[in-house]
Amino acid sequence: VTVYDAEGTKVQIDGSLRVEL
């Protein structure tokens, strides 16, 4: 799962929907 934080930084997360801001 690839998500983006509030600053548009690409954050790679395995098996989790948690976003590190």
Curated annotation (Swiss-Prot):
Q: How does it sit in the membrane?
A: Multi-pass membrane protein
Does Membrane show up as a keyword for this record? yes
Q: Which domain of life is it from?
A: Bacteria
UniProt-recorded Gene Ontology molecular function terms: porin activity
Where is the protein situated, by its record's location annotation? Cell outer membrane
Primary location recorded for the protein, binned into one broad class: membrane
Description of how the protein assembles with itself and partners: Disulfide bond interactions within and between MOMP molecules and other components form high molecular-weight oligomers.
- Tell me, in a sentence or two, what this protein's role is: Structural rigidity of the outer membrane of elementary bodies and porin forming, permitting diffusion of solutes through the intracellular reticulate body membrane.
Q: What is this protein called?
A: 40 kDa major outer membrane protein
Task: Specify the taxonomic lineage.
Answer: Bacteria, Pseudomonadati, Pseudomonadota, Gammaproteobacteria, Pasteurellales
